[in-house]
UniProtKB/Swiss-Prot annotation:
This is Probable phosphatase Sputw3181_2734. One of its GO terms (molecular function) is phosphatase activity. Its EC number is 3.1.3.-. It comes from Shewanella sp. (strain W3-18-1). Belongs to the PHP family. SUPFAM superfamilies: PHP domain-like. Zn(2+) 1 binds at residues 8, 10, 74, 193. One of its GO terms (cellular component) is cytosol. Zn(2+) 3 binds at residues 74, 102, 132. Its cofactor is Zn(2+). Signal peptide: none annotated. Binds 3 Zn(2+) ions per subunit. GO terms for biological process: bacterial-type flagellum-dependent swarming motility.
Amino acid sequence: MQYQVDTHTHTVASTHAYSTIHDYLAVAKQKGIRLFATTDHGPAMADAPHFWHFVNLRVLPRMVDGVGILRGIEANIKNIDGEIDFFGDYLKQLDIVLAGFHEPVYPPSDKATHTEAMINTIKSGKVDIITHPGNPAYPIDIDAVARAAAEYGVALEINNSSFEVSRKGSEANCTAIAKAAKEFGTILVMGSDSHVAFSLGGFERALAIIDAAGYPKSQLLNRSPSVLLGFLAQRGHHTVADLQALFDEAV
């Protein structure tokens, strides 16, 4: 199956990434990607874009040559209370909010602390997807996190980049996350975590993990634009309504 949705990408606005929105649109057309989210790192990261970058994402067109663009952020989990580095009404202007642990913002501690911080982030209602929860630098109680994510309707990401260029040793944790998600009915999503446009829609390693765990691919958020947009609308992102209408017209 061709997965046409990618929820996790970075542009040159995060200066350790190397592609523009235009680059992503070109690759999306080549690969048959119909919808992707631009989710640069939240402003607490040293090389992240300024706060205004995210406020001004509204200037991006909704769709270019049949490819939809979601205006988003990969925020940073800042502390054990699950606070993130984007807030208030500005969050409501975004289509999608991802959040995860990043060493420069919230250094690794211990399993209990990581678990509490992640669950508090899930409970906050501000975050739609937890990114790379299988990072071995941040061990968590996987069952507890999967149960909380299922209860609060938050998706857990199986991050393809974690098996290729970063977060080495994530395979066992991600397999356990996929198995727990199957058991507790947690929503999963595959994210390329692309830092260069050529990686857009690259899910091969993530899909292998999901297959090995026996997680039903029929429940993946990536399976169609309408599924992801419906998920985001249900979570209160009314900003996606116009994008939903454009995809409905294209059917």
